[in-house]
Curated annotation (Swiss-Prot):
Protein's UniProt keywords contain Phosphoprotein: yes
Family, per entry: Belongs to the CBF/MAK21 family.
Biased composition (Acidic residues): 79-93, 175-187
Localization per Swiss-Prot or TrEMBL: Nucleus, Nucleolus; Nucleus speckle
UniProt-recorded name of the protein: Nucleolar complex protein 3 homolog
Annotated region described as Disordered, given as residue ranges: 1-93, 160-187
Compositionally biased intervals (Basic residues): 40-51
Coiled-coil segments on the chain, per record: 451-490
Name of the gene encoding the protein in the UniProt record: NOC3L
Biased composition (Basic and acidic residues): 66-78, 160-174
Single Gene Ontology MF annotation: chromatin binding
Pfam families: CBF, NOC3p
Species this chain originates from: Pongo abelii
Length: 800
């Protein structure tokens, strides 16, 4: 017979997990329910006790026989009904009723000490009648002075608790009287000598005296630290503590002096390497005294430098949040001055200590301040970042700043100051890593054959050579020499972040005020852009120009960027840039003719890239049209702009020799010159002449006159019509800067209009002209004779 099969199914693992979860939940609920019930009971008991105390304190005793009169309410009535139902009065004896009445009249349970809100059975020790104790003590009069007692710990006996006391030792009354008299005298002296109010002059003298003392103290601490930094590193803490100066008369000035002093000290005593924290193994090992002293100096320097930076950060935060300290030593207006000094110190440390600890923390503090509402602070931070970019040879510090700026611009959704992106123009990036072929990257290692080894070096020599190479490599690492590969890698990463920022703005914020800075940056670094992006970038630039939303300066930057791309690696691309030539030709007459002639410099750069460097791709007709329009433009701009434009015209006439037909007034061609047409290829510039040069020859600026005469002569390199070397050897952009009137100076200086004539002093009625002087003297010396005047003969002759 077969064994009976168990019909119960084995529970699955999921079901087991489910049940195991339910049990703890039920336990937790039960536990919480118990806690709640105990709390409810405790609160109910406390409520009853408090009510009993109130009833005991009240004047009218509340009889407990009539509970209905005590508290009217449905709840009390229900309780009374329940009690009556539970114990009917018919079933009780008369003696029991009398006993209950007596107990109700006494209410002895209310005489307990119920001031503390504790349960009734909370303490084992029973409370005694406190009132009876005080009543049993006999009353005494105040004639005899009571002795002061000191209460000690009580002793517990069979009978109960026995309190222990001790008399307080009595001091001599004479001494007390003397002390009291001395105190009274001191109080009288203080009252008699009130604080005199100082006048303004006395207050200023007192402040000057305090300030001089603080200055001397700061100078003494700073000189001690500079003389021996390792021994006096603890004095840095003392000097830094003066940043919390509490004297309201000199607090602001002293804090500013301490900030600047500490900044200069850190610049002087900081080592030229980064200090790393010691490991546990290094701390446990025994070292020499010199090494231990150096370690203590480094630890102290890093900690004080860290606290100093935190103090500067807190000052800037307090000013930004308009916070006042509780002490109110520094006013809210003075916080701005303190914040400016703190920011200036941070900028100095950013530039001076790019290799030291916490440099990234300084960058994080400085970058948001570049976009500050205060123009002075924003310019200060931007100038510091530019200075850092210019002097950073390796590129490590520049990369850190670029990362923070890129993230900040993206986080603010491109609503930042354009000056932040203009700092990118100061980056020292000239080379980047170019993607190599896989064959070049994975070149097999070439080993020397036996014959090559025997011919070149012996075994011992090769061994020595390897040792020398290893030693040189270690020396390079120790001296932190600049590695070309590392430099290229850092520059490539930096430029990638810059281009990502630029392309984001071109894509998402085309109407942003950042666009001119982006286009200017693209124009500078266009030769380093990857060839893969050229087509898309040129399409975007042309779209921006055609949209008409750009100013003439922004559109010039677009043209400049496009031709920088095409003049570099873009030579390989088959792109016709005719639309960019047309746009530049059209924009020339839109240049500002007043003091803000910034666009002229961009035009000179564009002409150099578009016409001079691409001479083989430029037709003669296009060159003639540009020369004619440039000469017309030179008539209505400032002198330095005219000099730069005429210098560019001279270069174009040398680059395209056949353009000299514009100097010949008798030459003829087909068609009529159309000066207002915006197409340089079809304006028939060969049928005109450069008459503007004759007007420029009479210009008030002597250099403009020389250039005009030189171009009329055909721009010769030698002979009487040639220019001086200081003019011919300089580029158009250099001449534009050299003869600028931005500093309100005239180059060359203007000659005096009234020259002084030396050696001749006029005396009396003498004249400069000697003949006139002799004639006057002769007629004045002759004797005057009267002769009749007859004009009729002259009239007769004239009538005939």
């Amino acid at each position: 017979m077969k064994a009976r099969r168990n019909k119960k199914q084995i529970p699955s693992f999921r079901k087991l997990i489910k049940t195991s979860k339910v049990k703890p939940e039920n336990k937790l609920k039960n536990k919480q329910f118990k806690q709640q019930s105990t709390l409810k009971k405790y609160r109910k008991e406390q409520r009853k006790l408090r009510q009993a105390v109130k009833d005991a304190v009240s004047k009218k005793p509340i009889p407990l026989e009539n509970p209905k009169e005590k508290r009217p309410g449905k709840r009390i009535e229900r309780e009374e009904e329940e009690e009556e139902e539970a114990l009917p009065l018919d079933m009780m004896d008369e003696d029991d009723l009398q006993l209950m009445k007596d107990l109700g009249q006494r209410a002895s349970f209310l005489t307990r000490d119920l001031s503390s809100s504790e349960p009734v059975h909370a303490k084992k020790r029973k409370h005694k009648r406190i009132i009876d104790k005080y009543e049993k003590i006999p009353r005494t009069l105040q004639t005899v002075p009571e002795k002061e007692l000191i209460h000690l710990l009580p002793i517990k006996d069979k009978s109960g608790i026995i309190p222990q006391t001790r008399e307080k030792p009595v001091t001599d009354s004479n001494k007390d009287e003397e002390d009291q008299e001395e105190e009274r005298e001191l109080e009288e002296e203080i009252i008699e000598d009130p604080i005199q109010e100082l006048t303004i002059e006395e207050h200023l003298i007192e402040r000057k005296k305090k300030l001089q003392e603080k200055k001397m103290h700061i100078a003494a601490l700073a000189s001690a630290i500079l003389s021996d930094p390792e021994s006096n590193i603890k004095k840095l803490k003392e000097l830094r503590s003066m940043l919390m100066e509490q004297d309201p008369d000199v607090a602001v000035t002293v804090r500013k002096l301490v900030i600047v002093s500490l900044m200069e000290l850190f610049k002087d005593i900081t080592p030229s390497y980064k200090i790393r924290p010691l490991t546990e193994a290094e701390k446990s090992t025994k070292t020499r005294k010199e090494t231990q002293k150096l370690r203590e100096f480094e630890e102290g320097l890093v900690s004080q430098y860290k606290f100093y930076l935190e103090n500067l950060e807190q000052m800037v935060k307090d000013w930004k949040q308009r916070k006042l300290k509780k002490s109110n030593v520094v006013s809210l207006k003075a916080y701005k001055g303190l914040a400016e000094v703190a920011v200036k110190s941070l900028c100095e440390l950013l530039v001076a200590l790019p290799h030291f600890n916490f440099h990234n923390n300084i960058i994080v503090l400085i970058v948001p301040l570049m976009n500050d509402m205060s123009k002075s602070i924003s310019e200060m931070c931007c100038e510091a970042v530019k200075k850092l970019f210019k002097q950073d040879k390796l590129g490590q510090a520049s990369l850190g700043v670029i990362k923070v700026i890129s993230g900040f611009v993206k986080g603010r959704k491109y609503e930042v100051r354009p000056e932040m992106l203009k700092t990118f123009l100061c980056l020292r990036i000239k080379e980047v890593e170019v993607k190599k072929d896989t064959e070049d990257i994975n070149k097999p290692k070439k080993f020397m054959t036996f014959k090559e080894k025997r011919k070149s070096l012996s075994r011992m020599q090769r061994k020595w050579k390897k040792a020398e190479e290893k030693l040189e490599r270690e020396l390079r690492e120790a001296e932190a020499s600049e590695s070309t590969e590392k430099k290229l890698k850092l520059h490539t990463e930096t430029l990638n972040i810059v281009f990502v920022t630029y392309f984001r703005i071109l894509k998402k914020a085309q109407r942003s005020p950042l666009l001119p800075a982006v286009l200017e940056g693209l124009a500078k670094f266009a030769h380093l852009i990857n060839v893969e992006f050229f087509d898309d970038l040129l399409v975007v630039l042309h779209t921006l120009i055609e949209s008409g939303d750009l100013s003439y300066k922004e559109s010039l930057h677009c043209v400049q960027t496009a031709f920088h791309i095409l003049s570099g690696q873009g030579d390989v691309l088959n792109i016709d840039p005719m639309k960019f030539y047309t746009h530049l030709y059209k924009t020339l007459f839109k240049l500002h003719a007043g003091a803000t002639n910034e666009g002229v410099e961009i035009v000179l750069q564009c002409l150099d890239v578009m016409l001079t460097k691409r001479r083989k791709q430029v037709s003669q007709q296009r060159a003639l049209a540009f020369i004619k329009r440039l000469c017309t433009l030179a008539l209505h701009v400032l002198p330095n702009s005219s000099i730069g434009i005429l210098a560019t015209t001279r270069i174009l006439m040398h680059t395209f020799p056949k353009t000299d037909l514009l100097l010949d007034s008798e030459s003829q061609g087909s068609g009529v010159f159309l000066p207002e047409l915006d197409e340089p290829e079809y304006c028939n510039a060969q049928n005109t002449a450069l008459w503007e040069l004759h007007a420029l020859r009479r210009h008030y600026h002597p250099i403009v006159q020389r250039f005009a005469v030189h171009l009329i002569a055909g721009a010769p390199s030698e002979g009487s019509g040639a220019l001086k070397p200081e003019l011919s050897r300089r580029s158009a952009a250099e001449l534009f800067e050299a003869y600028s009137t931005a500093e309100m100076t005239f180059n060359p200086p203007v000659e005096s209009s009234n020259p002084k004539i030396k050696g001749k002093v006029l005396q009396g009625d003498s004249f400069l002209n000697e003949d006139l002087n002799h004639l006057i003297k002769r007629y004045s010396s002759e004797v005057a004779t009267e002769s009749p005047l007859d004009f009729t003969k002259y009239l007769k002759t004239s009538l005939h």
